[in-house]
């Protein structure tokens, strides 16, 4: 699968700026829904909160490393898997949790915490496992990834819009209340348009090569969902909390991952394919779970 690294993904500097803006717009919309009470609620449900954070920040990156050791993909694919595992949760987890009859308050608290800590946790986990696996360590030395620069970019993309959204909520509460639904809808619409445009520019490349990567993405996503579910069961959490942690573990911000790939890895084909496949598959698996759980009320 080494030839995947040489794939050319048509993604111009202007496209990178557009993706930056869309992700910032999405995070601003997320912040309009963020309330400090959501974070306070985590302390009241501390056991489930700790299990959820452990699943996201420690279990998934570690099990991804084990998966890479077992299947031994090309260094580019492995780096893509490590990066996605390190990315914070996707912004649709709260909605999927609601449809799944999970604990929405827990979902909001976990996803908010994940976004607030992303600038620190993402570069740390990526550097740890990227350097721990020798084939990717060699590749990272060749590329010379700057962890501080990555952390700063993640903060700009996620932290700045979050801060602006929180300030907007604090000083312009009426505007926030009237606009937050539209911000969320428009951000999803902009992202959908961007994905369609990107696919139109790279359709043949993606169609010809997606089967080489899809099985790895499905396997990793299955491990993520299964790991979150198993951890919740192990700690005997309420069923609604288990559903929430499962979803929070399996839905990741692949858009952020794709942006970092083009910013720091010159759009390396194998890494980009992992991020693109994740962006599609985690929605399929997440909504499939939501449909299944929507038919079944959680045990009390």
PLM feature segments, named:
Residues 1-300:
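Alpha-helical transmembrane segments of multi-pass small-molecule/ion transporters
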């Amino acid at each position: 699968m080494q030839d995947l690294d040489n794939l050319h993904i048509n993604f111009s500097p202007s496209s990178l700026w557009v993706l930056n803006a869309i992700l910032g717009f999405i995070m601003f919309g997320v912040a309009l829904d963020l309330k400090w009470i959501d974070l306070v609620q985590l302390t009241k449900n501390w056991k489930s909160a700790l299990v959820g954070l452990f699943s996201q920040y420690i279990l998934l990156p570690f099990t991804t490393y084990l998966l890479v050791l077992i299947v031994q993909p090309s260094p580019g694919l492995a780096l893509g898997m490590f990066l996605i595992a390190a990315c914070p949760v996707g912004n649709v987890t709260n909605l999927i949790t609601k449809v799944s009859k999970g604990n929405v308050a827990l979902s909001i608290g976990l996803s908010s915490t994940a976004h607030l800590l992303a600038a620190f946790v993402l570069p740390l986990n990526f550097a740890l496992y990227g350097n721990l696996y020798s084939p990717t360590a060699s590749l990272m030395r060749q590329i010379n990834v700057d962890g501080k620069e990555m952390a700063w970019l993640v903060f700009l993309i996620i932290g700045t819009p979050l801060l602006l959204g929180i300030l907007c909520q604090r000083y312009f509460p009426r505007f926030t209340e009237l606009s937050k639904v539209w911000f969320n809808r428009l951000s999803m619409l902009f992202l959908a348009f961007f994905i369609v445009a990107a696919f139109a520019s790279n359709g043949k490349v993606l169609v010809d090569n997606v089967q080489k990567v899809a099985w790895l993405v499905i396997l990793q996503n299955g491990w993520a969902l299964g790991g979150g579910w198993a951890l919740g069961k192990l700690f005997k959490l309420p069923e609604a909390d288990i559903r929430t942690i499962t979803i929070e573990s399996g839905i990741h911000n692949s858009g952020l991952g794709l942006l970092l790939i083009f910013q720091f890895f010159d759009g390396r084909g194998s890494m980009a394919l992992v991020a693109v496949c994740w962006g599609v598959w985690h929605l399929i698996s997440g909504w499939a779970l939501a449909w299944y759980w929507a038919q079944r009320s959680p045990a009390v």
